A protein has these predicted regions:
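An active-site-proximal structural segment forming one wall of the substrate-binding cleft
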Residues: 26-33, 92, 135-170, 305, ...
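Aromatic-lined carbohydrate-binding/catalytic grooves of carbohydrate-active enzymes
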Residues: 33, 38-83
Length: 400
């Protein structure tokens, strides 16, 4: 293993506050990790922490530092006050520097139900007019201002070496709302079409490119209705190829999809300019949802554009097999052969079943040329799975 490769762990700041910096640093070192990737902006949720023997509930989406309020307009972040007042991020950065360990931050941009519920007019709106309140729309000027303000604020206050960006795009229609219930199968093409946003800003953007949005809406409405009515047809294997089929048959869908890609690319490039001006490397997930990396377009992300903007593309290598992991990097290299790569691994029980399983996936990523490996997530793992990370990292060292 190259000495420059970063072996990191995703860490929640509340885990640092609860366990103490010394214990967290010890856990990282025992797992043979040389980088702490500490969250600074996160969504709400309920999380099982096995070593703490607790379920932790985050009732709102928020940041873990006190913002510079002069930077913001209508959209203003909510603050995890205890974490911010305790200066957890600054203390963790200092501890990492003293230990010779890398300090990065992991930043969630537009996946914010707290702000979305307060400002539904700034969220993604599907063909039926439903509002996805967990997803601020990147085409909205007010949302763009918020993203740039929060990003700048984070870099100025947290001062990471690198920032890993998540959920700064169009989130898909299926994202795990509280008690999300659906009795019908949702095929890939149906989910893709229901991820299309038709808010005023997206319509204006598309019309400025001479796209007939009225025709697109009629087409999407018809296709979605047919797919819903067909029901079980979406379960046949051929359906997986339906998106490509529809893009070729209907140029208007292709052009509207390109408008979505450009909206995301615009905001990512603006964040890259900010990071570059402050001497911070910008890394990013191609998608915030762990589907195949070549489906990142569901969230309006072009792999080619992402690779051109980001300092490092870090896909969620969460597939069900080593072959899936290998394909992840193959797909990126097809469109961006010179891309700088990282890899994020989840130790979810449905995907990783042993230390050998994890090590095989990590080796696949290393063979693909990744420069960083990040494991999810320190607070969500028991000691057994933390040891799997140690074994995987030791195995990588042996392959050097």
């Amino acid at each position: 293993m190259s000495s420059s490769r970063q072996n990191g762990m995703f860490i929640y700041p509340w885990d640092i506050a609860e366990s103490g910096i010394e214990a967290v640093m010890q856990a990282l070192q025992e797992a043979r990790c040389n980088t702490a990737v500490v969250n600074s902006s996160y969504h709400q949720g309920r999380f099982f922490h096995p070593r703490s023997k607790t379920f932790r509930r985050l009732p709102f989406s928020g940041v873990s530092f006190t913002p510079d309020w002069s930077k913001y307009n209508r959209l203003r972040p909510t603050v995890h006050e205890q974490i911010a007042q305790a200066g957890i991020l600054a203390k963790m950065k200092e501890a990492c520097e003293q230990a010779g360990m890398g300090f990065h931050t992991w930043w969630v941009g537009l996946h914010n139900s707290t702000l979305g519920l307060a400002h539904p007019e700034l969220c993604v709106q599907n063909i039926w007019g439903d509002t996805y309140t967990y997803a601020l729309c990147p085409s909205q000027p007010e949302v763009q201002h918020y993203a740039k303000a929060l990003f700048t604020d984070t870099l100025e206050q947290v001062k990471p070496e690198r920032i890993l960006m998540e959920a700064t795009a169009f989130l898909p229609m299926k994202h795990g709302e509280h008690h999300e219930v659906c009795l019908l199968p949702l095929g890939e093409s149906l989910q893709w079409l229901l991820s299309f946003c038709f808010c005023g800003a997206c319509i204006e953007r598309a019309e400025s490119k001479r796209i007939d949005v009225g025709a697109v809406r009629l087409l999407v409405s018809r296709l979605v209705s047919q797919m819903v009515d067909a029901d079980s047809i979406s379960q046949v294997s051929a359906e997986a190829r339906e998106v490509a089929f529809l893009l070729l048959e209907y140029p208007e869908l292709y052009h509207y999809q390109q408008s979505r890609l450009e909206a995301v690319d615009q905001i990512w490039r603006s964040l890259k300019e900010i990071a570059q001006s402050m001497g911070t490397a910008l890394d990013g997930f191609p998608s915030s949802t762990p589907f195949f990396v070549n489906q990142s377009y569901w969230e309006g992300v072009s792999l080619r554009k992402a690779a051109a903007t980001l300092d490092r593309v870090v896909p969620l290598a969460y597939g069900d097999s080593v072959g899936d992991v290998a394909y992840t990097f193959h797909a990126i290299k097809l469109v961006a052969p010179e891309a700088s790569l990282g890899a994020a691994f989840s130790l979810h029980h449905s995907q990783i079943r042993s230390a050998v399983d994890l090590a095989a996936r990590v080796k696949t990523a290393v063979d693909a040329g990744v420069q960083s490996i990040v494991y999810y997530n320190l607070g969500l793992l028991n000691n057994r799975r933390l040891d799997w990370i140690k074994q995987a990292n030791l195995a990588v060292e042996e392959w050097r």
